[in-house]
């Protein structure tokens, strides 16, 4: 057993059906509608935390947002968000998984589920909670009991063959983000090839190409999030 920084126990090696069932309910125990929860996963260094930061900056003036980060043994991602002041400190909570990242977002969601519920209690009502996974491989996916939709972030520096390789993260995420497009000429990645391969793997599921070197770079992802929020509120 490991613990989150706030002392929340995280039991490894088995699933939790009950929390997943509770989380899937769109209403809180008091009858109010809970926040939309969107998970962000992807390999180490693909730009997940930078994407979370950019989304917070883009959406925070119109929406009530909170973030849960996941790291194996540190608070590094949460500390990055705090240092860059993308949200007030009370709206950012870190979970130290102590195990493979996918364990905490798929196999045993108890610590993350408690973190999102604590945030709703502390700073709610919230419109949106972003749950960032620790860096993982192409098979990483979120439990449907933890998030309502998931974004999978890859980057061109990892190779333009990643969409073709597939894996559940690439093929099933509600949105695939191909990040760091500004680096494509320097690493020999063919963006058109990546788009075609992603289309073959994902069918009609959307793909966004981003470069976060400017504030406008997160625009396609922010637009997708706004559409999810509109559907959630309908």
UniProtKB/Swiss-Prot annotation:
InterPro entries: CobW/HypB/UreG_nucleotide-bd, P-loop_NTPase, UreG. Residues 1-29 are annotated as: Disordered. Belongs to the SIMIBI class G3E GTPase family. UreG subfamily. Homodimer. UreD, UreF and UreG form a complex that acts as a GTP-hydrolysis-dependent molecular chaperone, activating the urease apoprotein by helping to assemble the nickel containing metallocenter of UreC. The UreE protein probably delivers the nickel. This is Urease accessory protein UreG 1. GO terms for biological process: urea catabolic process. Keywords: Chaperone, Cytoplasm, GTP-binding, Nickel insertion, Nucleotide-binding. Facilitates the functional incorporation of the urease nickel metallocenter. This process requires GTP hydrolysis, probably effectuated by UreG.
